[in-house]
Amino acid sequence: MAANVGDQRAADWSSQYSMVTGNSRENGMETPMHENPEWEKARQALASISKAGATSSSKASSSGPVASAQYVSQAEASALQQQQQQYYQWYQQYNYAYPYSYYYPMSMYQSYGSPSQYGMASSYGSATAQQPSAPQHQGTLNQPPVPGMDESMAYQASPQQLPAAQPPQPSNSQHGTHSLSNGPQPGTAPSTQHSQAGAPTGQAYGPHSYSEPAKPKKGQQLWTRMKPAPGTGGLKFNIQKRPFAVTSQSFSSNSEGQHSSFGPQPNSENTQNRSGPSGRGNLSGKPDDWPQDMKEYVERCFTACESEEDKDRTEKLLKEVLQARLQDGSAYTIDWSREPLPGLTREPVAESPKKKRWEAPSSLHPSRGAGSVTRGGGAQSQRGTPGAGGAGRARGSSFTKFGNRNVFMKDNSSSSSTDSRSRSSSRSPTRHFRRSDSHSDSDSSYSGNECHPVGRRNPPPKGRGGRGAHMDRGRGRAQRGKRHDLAPTKRSRKKMAALECEDPERELKKQKRAARFQHGHSRRLRLEPLVLQMSNLESSGADPDWQELQIVGTCPDITKHYLRLTCAPDPSTVRPVAVLKKSLCMVKSHWKEKQDYAFACEQMKSIRQDLTVQGIRTEFTVEVYETHARIALEKGDHEEFNQCQTQLKSLYAENLAGNVGEFTAYRILYYIFTKNSGDITTELAYLTREMKADPCVAHALALRAAWALGNYHRFFRLYCHAPCMSGYLVDKFADRERKAALKAMIKTYVALHSAAFCAVALPRPLRILVSLQLLCWSPLPVPCS
């Protein structure tokens, strides 16, 4: 009955599933199951096997290729299927027939003798033996125990011979392809080929023995006994495993004589460096491995140093010398007791160009950052910096310190970044000022934000206020009761100086700061006048500098409308000097005849514009501005008068002939009108003796004195006798002074004052009225004026 059931089950499964040949089962690799020509023979053998088929099948596995396929009974298959569902139920949703081999190197190659992926027959017979090629090797893999299975199950591989006509296997990497199966067959799809491409470059894999005796199997393998679930057909997902990261450590063969297929063998170069005496001189070696006389030589070098600068130079020289000696192996052969000490010169060592943070440090020529690291770590730890025990002791145990210096630091970016993170993330209550191990020469090579120079220039940052505002945010309880002294004493300054980070470029920075004050005042005078470009006229109120745009006009028109320039002037619209003289004569005659101020002012401004555009500053220019000032003064336009008298002042400063005295007096009177005492004082200071003798200037000075003293009687007497056109300017502020005079007279009136004396400050129509009002109070007759 069991044979019939097994025969029926084998007949049902033969049309759906493939089988695993003896080769793939021997190697322990999982291959897709396809229909085999030997299936009919195996089915007939299974029908004749009783319940002890497991024992007979194990005996038949060594007889030939017909009995190489092993099967289990129906009861055992169902029990294994239940066990699979119990332990590997997570992977059944992907129709994965076998347990997910995360930790088991499963092969994706098909074995010889089985049909290809697309049902094509293999070109190699199943009974043909294979001989692995030179770069390929295989070995016994020690698999961890599978849950629920016997721990003593063996996983062995048997050597087979390849035919002579086999094509060579291509290699996808620079080292040998690690074939975990008997090799891919030619008909296999490219997706089923696998190569160890994740191994690091430069690792050599030694040959393994292929004559290793096979161990007797203690039980059938899990992937041999387990069958796919019914209904899944030939579907199978090749889920890629996580890449196996091969480290640089060498896995030696175990004591049982089994060879590991993953263990990289050390290359000959590394072996020589480790074995010979020169191998001890490797740059990554510790100073503890140095010869004793070499250590004494380093101590003598640092003992001879007198200052920190000497130690810096000695440290740099020793690094270059000792690294070269350790590299060529002469450090263990020379007599260090007779080796001369490196010469120390007082000149500062030329600074090497700064290196970027992301540049890898050179092994033969260490950068300046390495030296700064040793000073930051070694010197401070020996000086007794508080709180420098954690990282300082850790580094002190790895390197031997000579004269407050670590002569060698291993240029390892990974270790330096780890040390920097560990130091910056420490929660010690005191602030450590220590450089990080990042080998860069920049000024910001401190560990995080922890290293700030302590002193008067950089006080500690203040908080927002309130309780604990003097503390740094994020510190522990041990610092809450402490306050930062704003004015440190002499003793505290010495302690702070010991905590300061030593900057290797301190002297260079001092020289740069001193160089800024060697050339006197840093402000330099502008060599050329600041010119406003025409294409960048953003401020509409500022006039362009016409000195850079001097042109010669060609316009013959005597009259021209005044238009404000918004672009470069056109010579065809500008009148030359000859035409401008005719235009000035026309404006004078027109003003005398018609007194049309609007026309006269427009034409005078147009003439001034043409003179400015052409850069003409001659006596004719002075005449134009004086004429326009007189017309504006006569009409009472003090704005235009102010513009004209300002230009006349600059023209007179160029020693151009004109009515200098007259317009100087007008300027003084204009300052009295605006009550600009500062400009009045300046103008009086620049008056010469000859200028003061001018009648107009003398009158203006007398009027200014009466106005300043509040002598209104004298002020109005001078106002009545104003020369030239000074009266037009006094008219602008005469009413203001009359009111002030009346207030003064009302406050200080005495009957002894005559009406005629008081009437002087009044205009002529009011003199009679005031005289009549004052007659009733005055005992004396009023004299006729």
Swiss-Prot record:
<dbReference type="Pfam" id="PF03399">
    <property type="entry name" value="SAC3_GANP"/>
</dbReference>
<feature type="compositionally biased region" description="Polar residues">
    <location>
        <begin position="119"/>
        <end position="143"/>
    </location>
</feature>
<feature type="region of interest" description="Disordered">
    <location>
        <begin position="1"/>
        <end position="64"/>
    </location>
</feature>
<feature type="compositionally biased region" description="Low complexity">
    <location>
        <begin position="413"/>
        <end position="428"/>
    </location>
</feature>
<feature type="modified residue" description="Phosphoserine">
    <location>
        <position position="352"/>
    </location>
</feature>
<feature type="compositionally biased region" description="Polar residues">
    <location>
        <begin position="175"/>
        <end position="198"/>
    </location>
</feature>
<dbReference type="InterPro" id="IPR045107">
    <property type="entry name" value="SAC3/GANP/THP3"/>
</dbReference>
<feature type="modified residue" description="N-acetylalanine">
    <location>
        <position position="2"/>
    </location>
</feature>
<dbReference type="InterPro" id="IPR000717">
    <property type="entry name" value="PCI_dom"/>
</dbReference>
<feature type="compositionally biased region" description="Basic and acidic residues">
    <location>
        <begin position="32"/>
        <end position="43"/>
    </location>
</feature>
<feature type="region of interest" description="Disordered">
    <location>
        <begin position="119"/>
        <end position="292"/>
    </location>
</feature>
<keyword id="KW-0007">Acetylation</keyword>
<feature type="compositionally biased region" description="Polar residues">
    <location>
        <begin position="246"/>
        <end position="276"/>
    </location>
</feature>
<keyword id="KW-0597">Phosphoprotein</keyword>
<protein>
    <recommendedName>
        <fullName>Leukocyte receptor cluster member 8 homolog</fullName>
    </recommendedName>
</protein>
<feature type="compositionally biased region" description="Low complexity">
    <location>
        <begin position="47"/>
        <end position="64"/>
    </location>
</feature>
<feature type="domain" description="PCI">
    <location>
        <begin position="637"/>
        <end position="785"/>
    </location>
</feature>
<feature type="region of interest" description="Disordered">
    <location>
        <begin position="336"/>
        <end position="507"/>
    </location>
</feature>
<comment type="subunit">
    <text>May be part of a SEM1-containing complex.</text>
</comment>
<feature type="compositionally biased region" description="Polar residues">
    <location>
        <begin position="13"/>
        <end position="26"/>
    </location>
</feature>
<dbReference type="InterPro" id="IPR005062">
    <property type="entry name" value="SAC3/GANP/THP3_conserved"/>
</dbReference>
